[in-house]
Regions:
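Structural/interface elements that position substrates and couple domains in central-metabolism enzymes
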Residues: 1-197
Length: 197
């Protein structure tokens, strides 16, 4: 959220934890230890570019793009518990409007975006994916403590549930991210479209 706001975009952060929301709105990092988060967060909050809330549906209704980064827990047998992800998806669906891009960045089992969340978003919003809203999976490729560095260092991978979704996902991430120049990659560092298979 801070990265997107630092590019001049108005960003809403939604969280179920009221203390996290309070800290963010005060410009105080809720998770100490992230390099440069303290100064970057204070800057974007003071400029009015980042606001946090517990009301996900209301800020989704005001947004052109929704990026989902919610923990997915896995038990000892490797079975994922989708409880938090499902709850977030239902809240997003309540506020979803035509033309919105929804991007899941949480690491998910293959096919989850298309086979689980697309239907939940459609059912909860009355909208149709690919026609009324766009849906992509774009796994976060960052390590705690160096998020801003990793966002610049690694290509942003985007896979859409359809061609139009992939196109919108690529366009979105090109607007909100910066990339380091790297000669060791097979093509220019940036947003890489994985297609829509």
């Amino acid at each position: 959220a801070v990265q997107f706001a630092s590019k001049g975009h108005t960003v809403f952060g939604a969280d179920v934890n009221e203390e996290t929301v309070r800290l963010v709105n005060a410009g105080t990092e809720p998770f100490p230890g992230e390099t440069d988060l303290d100064t970057k967060l204070a800057d974007v909050v003071s400029k009015g570019l980042l606001t946090a809330t517990t009301d996900t549906a209301s800020v989704v209704a005001e947004s052109e793009a929704v990026v989902v980064v919610v923990p997915l827990f896995v038990d000892a047998e490797g079975t994922p518990d989708f409880g938090w992800m499902d709850a977030a998806t239902r809240d997003i669906a309540k506020g979803l409007k035509p033309g919105t891009l929804v991007s899941y960045e949480t690491t998910l089992p293959v096919g989850t975006t298309r086979n689980r969340f697309a239907q939940m978003l459609e059912d909860g919003s009355g909208l149709k994916v690919g026609t009324d809203f766009h849906l992509v999976f774009s796994p976060e490729r960052v390590f705690t403590g160096r998020v801003f560095e990793d966002l610049r260092k690694y290509p942003k991978l985007v896979g859409g549930v359809d061609e139009a979704s992939a196109k919108h996902g690529v366009e979105f991430y090109e607007q909100v991210l910066d990339f380091d120049v790297r000669s060791d990659l097979p093509k220019a560092n940036g947003v890489w479209d994985l297609g829509s298979s």
